[in-house]
């Protein structure tokens, strides 16, 4: 895995996957789409769509655990703090040889720099929340969210996907 290349691709994902507008109905549509994809693939994940401070969609598929709920919370907190995907933050820390605790004084009990939380960005408003998945390896969590966003925003996922690890 080439961290520098992945960071470039993630930056392109974050720049491209922007909603023209966003409301509770759109949150439900994106969350329900993620739920159906996960269910069809038989993957046990927790799914969370939220604006900062307000949950709009949550689902826990069969096989997901309370631990996944906590991962969702901590990954979402990371997006709220940095306004970047949790996977990008984790890769940047890996590249720098650090942790959220030693580089940013952020407690691991409240923040997670593992993939799966993606900034919910609205044109002319910026990052207003996050879309988070937990239950797969971090790269797969991240890519599941990107795949769903591409489907909803009319982008070709193959052009924004990370290279296979």
From Swiss-Prot:
Coiled-coil ranges per UniProt:
none
Q: Which domain of life is it from?
A: Bacteria
A Pfam family name for this chain?
HbpS-like
Family from the record: Belongs to the UPF0303 family.
Q: What is this protein called?
A: UPF0303 protein Bphyt_1734
Recorded source organism is Paraburkholderia phytofirmans (strain DSM 17436 / LMG 22146 / PsJN) (Burkholderia phytofirmans)
């Amino acid at each position: 895995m080439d961290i520098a290349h992945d960071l470039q691709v993630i930056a392109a994902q974050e720049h491209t996957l922007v909603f023209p507008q966003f409301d509770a109905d759109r949150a439900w549509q994106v969350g329900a789409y993620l739920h159906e994809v996960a269910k069809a693939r038989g993957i046990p994940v927790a799914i969370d769509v939220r604006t900062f401070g307000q949950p709009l969609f949550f689902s826990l598929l069969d096989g997901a655990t309370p631990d996944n709920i906590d991962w969702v919370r901590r990954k979402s907190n990371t997006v709220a703090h940095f306004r970047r995907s949790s996977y990008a933050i984790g890769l940047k820390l890996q590249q720098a040889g650090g942790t959220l605790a030693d580089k940013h004084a952020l407690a691991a009990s409240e923040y997670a720099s593992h993939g799966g939380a993606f900034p919910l960005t609205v044109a002319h408003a910026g990052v207003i929340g996050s879309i988070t998945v937990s239950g797969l390896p971090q790269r797969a969590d991240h890519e599941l969210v990107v795949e769903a966003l591409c489907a909803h925003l009319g982008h070709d996922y193959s052009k924004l996907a990370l290279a296979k690890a």
